[in-house]
Amino acid sequence: MSDNWIVQNLERALEIWNEKLAEIWMIITQSPENFKGGSIWSVITSIHGALQAIGYALLVLFFVIGVMRTCGSFAEVKKPEHAVKLFIRFAIAKGVITYGLELMMAFLSIIQGIISTIMNSAGFGTATTTVLPTEIVTAIENCGFFESIPLWAVTLIGGLFVWVLSFVMILSVYGRFFKLYMYTAIAPIPLSTFAGEPTQNVGKSFLKSYAGVCLEGAIIVLACIIFSVFASSPPVVDTTATAASMVWSYIGELIFNMLILVGSVKMADRIVREMMGL
């Protein structure tokens, strides 16, 4: 590492960015069951199990409401075709509540497989690191005291931007992970609405929303891969320009690429909704 304070500041900012990018890849490819040693998952499954009892009670309530609204009289309920239809609906709704956790984890496993396929197809097992070009390091180290004064301001502003973007991006990824926990914990309540025809849209909306949260992981990985390709081909540095101009041009282009990545990560939910019509 260079002894120059300006170079160290830029390299430290890029190091934090690379650390957060690597952390994103680790989180995206990790199962909620193994996250933080599985302690959070054990709490979530306990809550899910406790809410199943409430889900069964709501199952009966929504089933009765559905029967009352779809059947004009008790005589219609006694008809074989109506009775079979109601029985099948009740059985499916009960099965969805009982095995809801397994179904949700199976769907998440499918999405994790899609993410792994995307990463392997693109040839990115890990995130590509962003490195400060040697031309800029040499230009900064050759600057005198007065020439380096503008560089202090440029590197401080640029480093601060990189720090902020790093934490905004990782917070968005953690937010998606915590949404998976919340959906899993509360699942028995919305799934119980499948028991009644008038309330089944609530359950459908829940499953669509959960599918969207899972698919956000694939969008985030795609955004990281695109950024990694940008990072692997560093911006062209004009060696004839002054050191301040070189650094300002490099930081400006770097922050622009980072803003695109952070924006894509933060808007992953919106992109999924627009693509899948959720």
Q: What do these predicted ranges mean?
A:
Residues 1-10, 80-100, 203-213, 268:
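Alpha-helical transmembrane segments and their helix-start/interface "positive-inside/aromatic belt" motifs
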Residues 1-58:
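Binding/recognition "hotspot" determinant
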Residues 23-26, 82-89, 116, 120, ...:
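Short amphipathic alpha-helical coupling elements at transmembrane boundaries
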Residues 44-52, 84-88, 92, 141, ...:
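Alpha-helical membrane-interface segments at transmembrane helix boundaries
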Residues 53-65, 161-162, 180:
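Hydrophobic alpha-helical transmembrane segments
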Residues 58-94, 186-200:
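Hydrophobic transmembrane alpha-helix segments characteristic of membrane transport
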Residues 94-186, 224-277:
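Non-cytosolic segments of integral membrane proteins
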Residues 191-208, 240, 271-275:
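Alpha-helical transmembrane segments
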